[in-house]
Amino acid sequence: MEQNPNPNNLPAELNRTSLYLGLLLVFVTSVLFTSYFFN
């Protein structure tokens, strides 16, 4: 992960990271729910 000396880009990177984590959380939850539902 490259360091960016511009502090103005930090919130955008954190927002993008939280967005990816949110999508990953939804994906894992849906997989667990479907595997539990069809089991």
Swiss-Prot record:
Name the membrane topology term: Single-pass membrane protein
Task: State whether keyword Transit peptide applies.
Answer: no
The principal location of this protein is membrane
The transmembrane residues are: 18-38
Q: Which InterPro entries match?
A: PSII_PsbL, PSII_PsbL_sf
Give the location in the cell: Cellular thylakoid membrane
Q: Name one GO biological process term.
A: photosynthesis
Q: Where is the signal peptide?
A: none
- Which keywords appear in this protein's UniProt record, sorted alphabetically? Membrane, Photosynthesis, Photosystem II, Reaction center, Thylakoid, Transmembrane, Transmembrane helix
Q: What domain of life does the native source organism fall in?
A: Bacteria
One GO cellular component this record assigns the protein to is: plasma membrane-derived thylakoid membrane
Subunit record text: PSII is composed of 1 copy each of membrane proteins PsbA, PsbB, PsbC, PsbD, PsbE, PsbF, PsbH, PsbI, PsbJ, PsbK, PsbL, PsbM, PsbT, PsbX, PsbY, Psb30/Ycf12, peripheral proteins PsbO, CyanoQ (PsbQ), PsbU, PsbV and a large number of cofactors. It forms dimeric complexes.
Concerning its family, UniProt says: Belongs to the PsbL family.
Q: What does this protein do?
A: One of the components of the core complex of photosystem II (PSII). PSII is a light-driven water:plastoquinone oxidoreductase that uses light energy to abstract electrons from H(2)O, generating O(2) and a proton gradient subsequently used for ATP formation. It consists of a core antenna complex that captures photons, and an electron transfer chain that converts photonic excitation into a charge separation. This subunit is found at the monomer-monomer interface and is required for correct PSII assembly and/or dimerization.
- Protein name as catalogued: Photosystem II reaction center protein L
